[in-house]
Structures are given as C-alpha cells and as structure tokens.
Regions:
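Acidic/histidine-rich catalytic cores of soluble enzymes
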Residues: 59-60, 155-242, 249
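Active-site acidic/histidine proton-transfer and metal-coordination neighborhood
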Residues: 11, 81, 85, 100-193, ...
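Acidic-and-aromatic substrate-binding clefts and catalytic sites of carbohydrate-active enzymes
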Residues: 37-43, 63-74, 96-107, 132-141, ...
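Short, acidic/polar
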Residues: 40-51, 105-116, 207-211
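Conserved, mostly hydrophobic/aromatic
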Residues: 32, 52, 60, 82, ...
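Catalytic domains of carbohydrate-active enzymes, especially glycoside hydrolases
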Residues: 48-63, 120-121
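N-terminal export signals
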Residues: 5-24
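C-terminal segment of N-terminal export signals and the immediately downstream linker at the start
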Residues: 21-51
Length: 287
C-alpha cells in the first residue's frame, strides 16, 4: 500500500469511528521517547530531561541501559532526576541481545533488570530491535519464547514485556503470515503487549487501524512519529507529515492504548523546537 492509499483508507476509517474515542484520549499524558533528544542526552542527561519537562511532556520512555546504568547513572539517580523534573517513566527500551539470542542465558540478569525497572516504576520493559542476523522464522520463534519467559517473571513485579516494531516485522514468514502477526498470536496476551511504531507501520504500507481491529487491546503503547512528504520518508515533527493522527487517535480504544511517546529521528531545526512543535500540535489539534 502506498502512502496515498494509506492516507485514503485512514480517512475512510475515520468516518466509521465514533467520537467516543476523542473523549477517551483526553485522559492520556503525553510522553516522549528519550532517544529523540539523544544528542542532548550525550551532553547532559540533566539538561535533556529539563528540556523535555519545559516543553510540557509528562513522561519519558527510557533507553540506553547497559551494565545496570543509564548513561553512567544508576536507576536510583535517574529516578531522582525524573522526580526533580516532575517526569515519570512508565516504559523503557532495553536491548536484550543476550536474553534473546543466548541459549544458555542466565535469568539472574533479567531479575536485576526487573529490580531496576521496578525502582523506576516501569509498567513495561520494551524490546526495541532485533539484529539483522536474527530475523529468520526460527529466530522469531525463539525470541517469542524468550519474551513469554521473561514476561512470566515480570508479572511478579506487576510489569509487562512489550515489543516495538520497525518495518521488517511486516515481512511474510514461512507460514504466509507476517512475523508480527505470529508474535502477537504466540505471546501470552495477559503478559505481553505491543508498541506500534506508527511511522514504521506506515512506511511498510500498513494501516495501523487495521492492526488495532485484528488484535484489539494488544497495542497498548504507540510511537507517535510522523513521516515527511517527499521521497525520503524521513521522520518529522508530529502534524507536519502525511500521517492522519486524528483518525488514528480516534481508534485508540480499540488499540487498548495506555501510553504513547512522541519520537523524531531527523531534524530541520533544534530538537527542543521540534518536540515543542509536536506537543503543541497534539494538544491543539488531536487531544
């Protein structure tokens, strides 16, 4: 499906959706994926969080966890910085290659992660990426099994495991279904949710609303990332691209949406201006 068809189908879907969703969405806080301001994080985590709070965001989705540290800071230190800026961290992206790929993985490492995530008051531990060398049908099957195992342990911490898509998950697996569809069907719905990156779904020619309808309640997290006009399809400020956000947010109840995170990877102006424009558009035109 090309972008014009995607936009057209979304517009048709809007007519079929009730206005009930717009009342529902006003309950949501506005979050941001911290990776959006990664260059500022590299300069100063403190400054990055201050800039996010100043722009009006309520919570951040963390990234950068390694050896029990975020950018050289402990979970307790990050928690303190979040509190200083009146921010929450309901979710975090965690690159878990060892857990996903290592047949002899020591699950004690997972428990350390759960301890740190609990300290940060996470509700979700999100797996954001699979390496290109680990995307076969067998790889996805093993990853799905590991996600279920990890999620079973996370339940004791009142957390769920999530999986975040790019475009490759929409490729067909050996059984004729997409890898993402197989993952959704083969994970425990009581323990595992999915974070739909709206940009990557559109990039792959998918209609997000179709996925919400096929798997209601499973996409509790979203990445709200817009796609610029033109052939490069780069990300841009929310509201400046081709994605119909009003239509998508009207379907949030079907999706099961709990939290969404603004994200942007390419900039044509200073990043804090970008995130201010995005939240301004959402507050004025969508929420």
């Amino acid at each position: 499906m090309n972008r014009r068809a995607f936009i057209g189908q979304s517009a048709l879907a809007a007519a079929a959706l009730s206005m009930q969703g717009f009342a529902f969405q006003k309950q949501h806080q506005i979050g941001i994926q911290l990776y959006t301001v990664r260059d500022e994080v590299a300069k100063s985590v403190e400054g990055a969080l201050q800039g996010i709070a100043k722009a009006g965001y309520d919570h951040v989705e963390l990234y950068g966890y390694q050896d029990r540290l975020f950018f050289g800071k402990t979970a307790a230190q990050i928690k303190a910085l979040l509190k200083q800026n009146k921010l929450q961290a309901h979710s975090g992206h965690y690159l878990l290659q060892d857990m996903l790929y290592n047949k002899t993985y020591n699950w004690d490492s997972w428990k350390y992660l759960l301890d740190d995530a609990a300290l940060l008051q996470h509700q979700y531990i999100v797996i954001p990426w699979l390496d290109a060398a680990h995307r076969t049908g067998d790889d996805f099957k093993r990853v799905t099994e590991r996600i279920n195992e990890g999620a079973a342990l996370a339940k004791a911490y009142k957390m769920k495991v999530g999986y975040h898509n790019h475009d490759f998950e929409f490729q067909k697996a050996g059984n004729g279904k997409t890898f993402l569809e197989n993952m959704i069907r083969d994970t425990d719905p009581g323990l595992v949710d999915f974070e739909l990156d709206i940009y990557w779904a559109a990039y792959a020619g998918q209609d997000p609303i179709d996925w919400f309808r096929r798997f209601p309640g499973r996409f509790t997290l979203w990445h709200v990332k817009d796609m610029s006009q033109g052939p490069n399809k780069q990300s841009c400020e929310v509201g400046k691209g081709v994605i119909d956000w009003k239509t998508i947010f009207a379907a949030q109840k079907t999706s099961g949406l709990k939290y969404f995170f603004v994200e942007q990877e390419h900039y044509t102006q200073p990043v804090f201006n970008c995130i201010a424009d995005s939240i301004g558009y959402l507050k004025k035109e969508v929420l």
